[in-house]
Amino acid sequence: MPVTATSWLRPMRGGSQTHLIKASDGHHYVVKLSNNPQGIRTLVNEWIAQRILSYLKIPCPEIEIVDIPQSLIDATPKLGILRGQVMQAPPSGWHFGSRFPGDPAVLTVHDVLPDIQLVTCRNIHHFAAVLTFDKWLANADSRQSVFYRARLLDVLANEEKFPDPEYAMRGLVASMIDHGYCFNGVYWDFPDAPAYGLYYRAEVYRRIRGWADFEPWLERIQSFPESVLDKALHEIPRAWLEPSEQEELTNLLDRLLARRSKVPSLLEATKDRFPNHFPNWR
């Protein structure tokens, strides 16, 4: 069941004009509105992408459908989409929510870090992991992430490579966000390009020395179960889809499964086009 928006905190940065909202479950969400300038299909893309990332065990925020009541919209003039000089209010109803990783009054979240801090990120290897995902889903955006300090157990509990004794420690971690441009955004196709999904800071890829550094995620993609996509498809609110789009989306996911074997060649094309990002990959 959706959570209900109870209070608005502030607008967030970015082209989709998201808003930070507190919900009835006590959590805060970065909410992408259904009337956002990038199109309602980006909500569908976000939902499917998170379900795939979760199965692949790549850190990303929890998601919920956020029900925004008309009473909150009426009481909050800044809750909406700015088009030119006009603020366009969202429709009441169901929107996409990406859970903020803590209390925004206490937790500092960064979307950019200097290299001296970036190299201390405890799960920097997940940038190799998420690159496999971005290639598979034809993420036509650059890789977006946020960084914050957290108990490592809470973020890396499913991480096979992480040493157990350090689980109780706190450290700087990365969480992968902003997947509206997967499937080439509203176009729902797969126009592959070497730059797609690449993080703009080469430092996150310097530890990559070969194909082993993309495991176990490449293997998880190759054996990805259709049932995960079926479940995600049935979770998507019908209000986010036109009747004619249901079949189109089903066909898109069929094509996604059919291109799993293409991911290694897409990674190699990226390495060849941007060798400075992968100086140690031989």
Predicted features along the sequence, with ranges:
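Phosphate/dinucleotide-binding and metal-coordinating scaffold of catalytic cores
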Residues: 1-282
